[in-house]
Amino acid sequence: EKLMKKTLIVAAMMALVATGASAKTAKDSAAIAKNKPVFTVVKQNPITSIKDQNRSGTCWAYSTLSFFESEILKKTGKTYDLSEMYVANKTYMDRATMAVRMHGDVSFSQGGSAYDVLYALQHYGIVPENAMPAPGTLTGDSLANFGEFFDVMTPYVEAVAKSKAKKISTAWKSGLQGIIDSYIGETPEKFTYEGKQYTPETFCKSLGINLDDYVTITSYTHHPMWSKFAVEVQDNWRWPLSYNVPMEDLCKIIDNAVNNGYTVAWGGDVTEDGFTRKGLGIAYDVKKVRSMAGTDADRWFKLSKSEKNVKLDSLGVNAPEIVPTQKMRQDAFDNWETTDDHGMHIYGI
């Protein structure tokens, strides 16, 4: 879904081509080079430097803070590097509290949504990157790595949430906060930035953006169009309301937004065939691709994702694409084929 400025906002993805390792590597590589798409930049809005979430499920924090950094840059001309770990610290405690309150019926995981970042800024403020320990450094790494962190934290939260006790104590919160602080750092009450002292709240207010100016927009038919509803996915655990508009209007909003200089925090799905870590997702017509690639249905479904991507990439610009419809989008959401597994910052066309 999209966290968007009320008036306008953003979009675009870029694609490279992935290569594959197989007996036909040379042949496939030649085909890829011949058919490689060439992209023309139509619009590229200003963004801050790209950060690496590494082995942490914090795409929602990195992408949405990047979005807000772009908003600040557009509005004030100033470049900031805001702390993802500050937002993660606050959000994980809130999510654990909700999981316990709901006796485990709200999931507890590394993931989140763009709204989690907006909520954190509104309720807890924000700090610059250097006001917290650098991601990964508290565990001897140079980048965030949440493997051990959540191996410890998840069963801790589940033990409390699924407790058979008739009454639980409040001690679990201080214990959990200690775990969070140990792995990603304590959140400061005060800090100095460019010679001036701030609290997280006063620093957030100094950034020059109005946090009430942002909304979430989506498009599904199981709720009335032009109404608001909470999108039913696990990482949308705060249940914020999204404006529901037809898919065609959603696309128009994006096109209009990016061409007017805005960017967007986008929550989407990168698990479909045709989306690789090195490229842009292309909505391939899989039935036609199977035929063009000389692969029958049974063999196609037995191929690994990387093997499928090699075949898809070899077709390149000749690969047939579907024309997405509102019904396709809805069907894929209803049957779990499409979900909300990755947050991105879209900034151009």
Across the structure, where does each feature detected by a protein language model lie?
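Positively charged n-region of N-terminal signal peptides that target proteins for export
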Residues: 1-7
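Sec-dependent N-terminal signal peptides
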Residues: 7-16
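Boundary at the C-terminal end of the N-terminal hydrophobic targeting segment
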Residues: 20-25
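Catalytic-core signature of thiol
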Residues: 26-349
